[in-house]
């Protein structure tokens, strides 16, 4: 699949969402809401569910599948209260010893005036800091777009995976082309230079695993992700805490 098709597929409105994975993978998934400071952000969803006999905290960025739903979800662009909700749930997981799984699909954090006034940069930076030392295993999965700091704020993890037809980048190809050449129409040319596809990032050791989507139905893909999570969470849970945190630290220091 060429780069243009991969970008289109990553942005496809019918693509599986965080809630699709959360309800399909985890038994008795219960959503939790709000950051306890300002309001609930529909762009970030999270809660607790069971993976076998293991309770897991699930957090992710949610895009809509219709115009009305996208308006509710702010087209998957979180406000600072969304990132603060995510952090609240992750600290709750740490307190009770639950591993964390994050699902990421965003073009980036919302850049509006109100979001900046409420501390968008601080909220993202705090998540990076807190996740780097969170004392439970973390697995992050990019399921569509992984855009800029808005994606990284949920991706400081022990393992970072990508679905095969997803992308992960410092900014959109359109933004890159506009900055570099003052011509947004050269977006796909920019995408080739940026190395944003799953297999390119796996080769550069930015991500740890690519989950194949070829020939799989939605149910089969969810089942595949569930199996991978069960195996990897069991492995990570056996690591001594000091080793887990040191490996996470070194994983990001190497860049």
Curated annotation (Swiss-Prot):
Key words of the record: ATP-binding, Cytoplasm, Fatty acid biosynthesis, Fatty acid metabolism, Lipid biosynthesis, Lipid metabolism, Nucleotide-binding, Transferase
Localization (cell): Cytoplasm
Gene Ontology CC annotation, any one: acetyl-CoA carboxylase complex
Chief location bin: cytoplasm
Keyword Translocase assigned: no
Functional pathway: Lipid metabolism; malonyl-CoA biosynthesis; malonyl-CoA from acetyl-CoA: step 1/1
Domain of life: Bacteria
Domain CoA carboxyltransferase C-terminal: 1-235
A single MF term (Gene Ontology): carboxyl- or carbamoyltransferase activity
EC number in record: 2.1.3.15
PROSITE patterns, alphabetized: COA_CT_CTER (PS50989)
GO annotation (BP), single: fatty acid biosynthetic process
Enzyme class: transferase
Catalytic activity annotation: N(6)-carboxybiotinyl-L-lysyl-[protein] + acetyl-CoA = N(6)-biotinyl-L-lysyl-[protein] + malonyl-CoA
Function: Component of the acetyl coenzyme A carboxylase (ACC) complex. First, biotin carboxylase catalyzes the carboxylation of biotin on its carrier protein (BCCP) and then the CO(2) group is transferred by the carboxyltransferase to acetyl-CoA to form malonyl-CoA.
Subunit organization: Acetyl-CoA carboxylase is a heterohexamer composed of biotin carboxyl carrier protein (AccB), biotin carboxylase (AccC) and two subunits each of ACCase subunit alpha (AccA) and ACCase subunit beta (AccD).
Family, as annotated: Belongs to the AccA family.
Protein name per UniProt: Acetyl-coenzyme A carboxylase carboxyl transferase subunit alpha
Organism in which the protein naturally occurs: Streptococcus pneumoniae (strain CGSP14)
Gene behind the chain: accA
